[in-house]
């Protein structure tokens, strides 16, 4: 299509650079104008003018809203002249496509919008897109890959598998709302990533050809704080961790099943790990694209532990008890059965302790 291409449909004319209107007669004319404008989904101004339904894309549904308000007052009045008319339609068509995303100052963009082959849950994809933040980024300083976890509401707590029930500290189940998006490491922190920052390797599983890409372990909650302060990262809260692990599922395991044998596809655990850790990312990701949320190594989260906390937990952005003797661990590990890799299972340890099946995953604010 040339830079200046004209399509004429009765009293409706459309140029590549602008549209003019003698009268508005049919939706087919509008569609033809859109075609003449070659309106493909591309990033645009951050203001996202014309996105009337808030899904971060200016497209057919927004056009329908605007036409439904024709010659009336409404959100479709994009130029603010008091009436929805042809000028507003021209603005919308000129802004057609995806809204631009915000890339955090600490990050390097990899992919702006969620890949449906990775973020397989359509509700999560829509929530990520609606956030206005880039989906997949690298932390520039560490080159660690991070994925956006959108805000959302979920039921936190006990989900039984076909073979195992819950323990008391997984109850009562309760609704939790996370109001802010955050970034989560796509993988557990590896031995190499730890060594680059901390100049030593505490891990038990060194000396293998893939050791650099195995999760770092033998790291205490207390020691991890030095790594976090040097990188600007943080540990996820327990609620953030479970929301990210579940990735829209309500089943025992984050693959959408409560059938214990299916764990083999998503987790390194006692029956398939061969008494050792494995390189991160070797098992299937969950519906947010996060790997090893179940199995491989336990993951420290930020919260103190209190077995009765779920009974008094705030429903919005819970951060755990204000004090305690133990910190929470999540996700199970290579040493444990399917019971422990359930999305709701909670374990604990003293913050100064280390074990060869305990590691961590980072989070970061946008």
Residue ranges, per PLM feature:
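N-terminal secretory signal peptides that target proteins for export/translocation
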Residues: 1-23
